[in-house]
Regions:
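Catalytic pocket-lining loop regions of alpha/beta-barrel enzymes
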Residues: 1-102
Length: 102
């Protein structure tokens, strides 16, 4: 997972070199095969989830706090999910900031 400490040297090097890291979503989606009529629709719906998941790993593990100049780019995942995700993150923050997890 991207929150693994084994990625720390990559985050540090990219930040030091002022080099954006690109995440292209969709590579981890299982192959549903062409025999299933909804295969393409299932793939298209899951593409943005994989981008979100990568971003969540970095956000919640503190990567962006440890590397404030790290540049992260999500490509080919659309942006329709961004407003709803930001709203959810704000809600989670409000609920968790005074808990033992905050």
């Amino acid at each position: 997972p991207l929150y693994s400490a084994s990625y720390q040297p990559i985050w540090a090097a990219a930040e030091a070199c002022d080099m954006p890291l690109n995440h292209h979503s969709g590579g981890a989606t299982p192959n549903f095969g062409s025999h299933f009529p909804a295969s393409l629709a299932m793939f298209m719906l899951e593409v943005s989830w994989w981008s979100q998941r990568a971003l969540w790993h970095l956000m919640f593990s503190g990567v962006f706090e440890r590397h404030p100049d790290l540049q992260w780019v999500n490509t080919e995942s659309g942006t329709a999910w961004v407003p709803d995700t930001l709203e959810k993150l704000d809600s989670f923050y409000e609920r968790m900031k005074y808990s033992k997890y905050g």
